[in-house]
Amino acid sequence: KEISKKMLSITKSMALHGLEGFLIDVQVDISSGMPSWDIVGLPDVSVKEAKERVRTAIKNSGYELFSRKIVVNLAPANIKKEGSIFDLPIAVGILKSLEVITQNQNDDILMIGELSLNGSLNPINGALPICIEAKKQGIKKIILPKQNEKEASIIAGMEIFGASDLNEVVKYLNGDIKIESLSTKWEDCLKLGKEKILDFADVKGQESVKRAVEIAAAGRT
């Protein structure tokens, strides 16, 4: 296959440090030359491991990943990138560069999600604070794993799209299918199942945040 002249793509994601979020541009460049794959931009070990997860997920989703030189830059480079939430935006960026994803009006969508080797999306930690921070920074649309959809959808004024796998994301971005944006009332998220009771003791650290929540709750009684 001939390499397209447009082999650079940018997909939005977010890095979370504590409760503070930083918008990340996942830049993917694909060129001819010695086949290789590098991830730069201060990634931790789990982000570096995304190479094999993403490569296999793309292949098992039915897309051909040609032998190319692939460089993934997570910008800005001075912010440490942690966790597996960049799997989805990296995969989408590669498929944009290969022109598997052809629609151009998706640049304003933020994406987070961990990929399984079969292309399915696994739930992630920190979806709610990521979505809160994304809204503060002007993001209106987010694609994330289906399992995180409900918690994220309590945020008013945002379109939250939950996807089950990489194929579903590709079809949605190409306009082949529709994914309904979920909206959930805050009260619905407070209904706890009988099988599990949540407790602040389960939260590691964040003492000042827990104290602030306790004070806020006391003031509403």
Please identify what each model-predicted range represents:
Residues 3-221:
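Peripheral, non-AAA+ core regions of ATP-driven protein-machinery
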